[in-house]
Regions:
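Extended, helix-rich structural scaffolds rather than catalytic motifs
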Residues: 52, 60-65, 276-332
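Extreme N-terminal leader/anchor segments
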Residues: 39-105, 110-117, 147-154
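Alpha-helical transition-metal enzyme core signature, strongest for iron centers
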Residues: 128-136, 159-170, 174, 192-200, ...
Length: 332
């Protein structure tokens, strides 16, 4: 009897579901069509509202142009340039910190290096720190005011942070491998080195200048050219099984720099599209001229560092290769 009663209840449930299913089909299909139409109308209305919102408000950096304007928040649900989201995702995927790299494993190799090799390493990394400090505090930040989209502003803040991470990473090498006296001497050398100062000031002059396109050209060339003479040394050592963990960290930095240079170059091209042929010719000539100046400075700086160890010929090839890669970021 117990089994029979349970069986009857199951049959009753199945019968009710069969009877109800046609009704469910009729009641669900029609609203789907209605909802599709409704969503389409909502999307059109939302697009119109978004355009209206943009026309009556500004992002925070634009406050300086119109203090009376309404301020709007960044909306990642409405991305006008897909490249902004693509680069943002690439940057966050690539995120790393120097504390995760086992630099202390390089200590035995460091102790076997000659005093000349260690001195060169300290100076090379201090030079890299100088340029990354320029980028983190000025180079990326100064491009925010000229951003074409609000998401571009966010990407530059992301890049600026990673530039600070890069600068921090060289200090991690110093604190792991060398003494406070050696570190202080390397920083003193960087301040007093005329070629290093000239490289930094050449781009800073345009960062603080009035031309937004020249800022982007300068930033692209710093990320794509000026740093690479410094990157050569740890890569050279790693080929000879020396400072291999430091070289792994440099490869992480190189991966970031490739994205940074590409993005600034891309935004430069987008900005150039809306200008006159005369302006495009002006910027083309400026880009080539600045690249040649920085390339010459890079060779002079590299010669001062690498000639004593007989590495300059290989470094010159490496610098020339990256100068051509920098031009590719401008489609030149």
């Amino acid at each position: 009897l117990h089994w029979s009663a349970r069986r009857q209840r199951q049959m009753c449930i199945r019968d009710r579901s069969k009877a109800a299913s046609p009704v469910l089909c009729r009641s669900t299909v029609l609203p789907l069509v209605h909802n599709h139409s409704l969503r389409k109308k909502e999307a059109m209305s939302s697009t119109s509202n978004s355009a209206e919102l943009t026309s009556i408000s500004v992002t925070p950096p634009s406050y300086r142009h119109d203090p009376s304007a309404r301020i709007r928040a960044i909306n990642w649900n409405r991305v006008s340039d897909d490249k902004d989201l693509e680069v943002w995702n690439r940057l966050t995927t690539n995120f790393w910190l120097p504390e995760k790299v086992p630099l202390s494993n390089d200590l035995p190799a460091w102790q076997k290096m000659t005093p000349e090799e260690r001195n060169l390493t300290m100076r090379v990394f201090t030079g890299l720190t100088t340029l990354d400090t320029v980028q983190a505090t000025v180079g990326e930040i100064c491009q925010i005011q000229d951003a074409r989209t609000e998401h571009e502003e966010a990407v530059y803040t992301n890049i600026a942070f990673m530039q600070s991470v890069h600068a921090r990473s060289y200090s991690s090498v110093f604190s792991t491998l060398s003494s406070t006296k050696e570190i202080d001497e390397a920083y003193r050398w960087a301040v007093n080195n005329d070629l290093l100062q000239a490289r930094a000031k050449k781009v800073l002059a345009h960062y603080f200048g009035p031309d937004p396109l020249k800022r982007k050209v300068s930033s692209t060339l710093l990320s794509s050219l000026l740093l690479y003479a410094g990157f050569y040394l740890p890569l050279h050592f790693s080929v000879h099984a020396t400072l291999t963990n430091t070289a792994d960290m440099i490869r992480l930095i190189l991966r970031d720099k490739a994205v940074h240079g590409y993005y600034s170059g891309y935004k430069y091209q987008r900005g150039l599209e809306s200008t006159t042929p005369l302006r495009q010719k002006e910027m083309h000539d400026f880009t080539i001229s600045l690249l040649e100046e920085l390339y010459a400075l890079e060779l002079d700086y590299s010669g001062e560092l690498y000639e004593p160890l007989g590495l300059m010929d290989d470094v010159a090839v490496f610098v020339r290769y990256n100068a051509n890669k920098a031009l590719m970021n401008f489609c030149l």
